[in-house]
Each structure stands twice: as C-alpha cells, then as structure tokens.
Amino acid sequence: MQKLCFQVTSFTRKSRRYNSYKGNVGKIAPNRINRRFNTSIPHQKITTDTTEFKYYEIDNKGRMVIKKLYLDPFLDMFNGEVLSYGISKTPSAASVLSAQKQAIEITSDCPYRRTFHSDRGWAYQMGAYSSILKENKIFQSMSRKGNCYDNSVMENFFGILKQEMY
C-alpha cells in the first residue's frame, strides 16, 4: 500500500456513513425476501447494496488527501459468493447497471424465477434498473425504509469486508 502512496485509517463506525437513500425517486418494490435469506437453489436470491470506502492518498505536494471509492456488489444468498461488482470514484448509475448486467448473465442458469433484493437507494429505484429486471423476468425486492435488518446479508458482508480492510 505504501508503494502505491495509499494510507488507510483504522476502521471506525463513523467511517461507514454513506447513505444512498434520497427519498422516493422512482418505483419502490415490495419486500419479497422478508428476511427469508436461506435458499437451497444457487442464483435464485441475489442481494445488492452500495458502500463507501475512504482512504488517504498523498498528492504531488506531499499532502494527504481523503479519497473515496464506491463498491456495488451483487451477492448470491445461496453461498455468499460475490457474483459481480462495480467500483467507481463517485456513486454512479453506470457502475450499478454494469454490475447488474453481469449478475443477470451469471444467474441466467437458474431454473426458477430469480429475485434481486436491495435497499431503497436511488440507484435501485431508477427506471433503467427496474426495467432491466423486468425484461429478464426477475422479481425486484426492496427492504423497508430505514431497516438494515431486511438486507442484513449484504450489511454483514460489508461489515466483515471493512474490518478485514482497515
């Protein structure tokens, strides 16, 4: 990390403050998962969310500057495997949609109708996101507002990832 001029701060709860909720900016899907996270069928239940990572980088003047990266993974609830992901320097629809497209291709072998579950972030309320799911006959599911337990599989993954990183 030092060779790349990165310096990471210690992990704190305060550093996990990214919130993608911007009110109702699109369609709110019903909560089809209802905390039934277990499945015996691979690629049937997929969960996603966006998280923010902060890191320090030394600029050309030798000063440390805070930078951010945004991760948009799609995780299979069958075995906890990350099927696809997008990384960007700003929260972007392009990152979410490209990761969504990869996840749809990977899960196309599922013999049953798939469900993609997320929180109510702006990216998952977009018409483009919803219409791609509809075109591929995939159910869209969203957590209740302000309820992290409805997407606890993804939140737990982020918690472990950040503890390992920082």
Model-derived segments and spans:
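Mobile genetic element proteins and their domesticated derivatives, centered on retroelements
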Residues: 1, 8, 33, 49, ...
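Basic, flexible linker segments flanking DNA-binding modules
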Residues: 1-41, 147
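RNase H-like two-metal-ion nuclease catalytic core shared by retroviral integrases
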Residues: 19-20, 24, 118-120, 126-127, ...
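An active-site-proximal beta-strand-loop segment
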Residues: 35-83
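Cytochrome P450 core scaffold surrounding the K-helix E-X-X-R motif
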Residues: 55-57, 94, 126
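Active-site beta-loop-alpha junctions of metal-dependent nucleic acid enzymes
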Residues: 67-68, 85-109
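Short small-residue beta-strand/loop micro-motif enriched in glycine and branched aliphatics
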Residues: 79-85, 140-143, 166
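Cysteine/selenocysteine-centered motifs that mediate thiol-based redox chemistry or coordinate metal-sulfur cofactors
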Residues: 108-127, 131
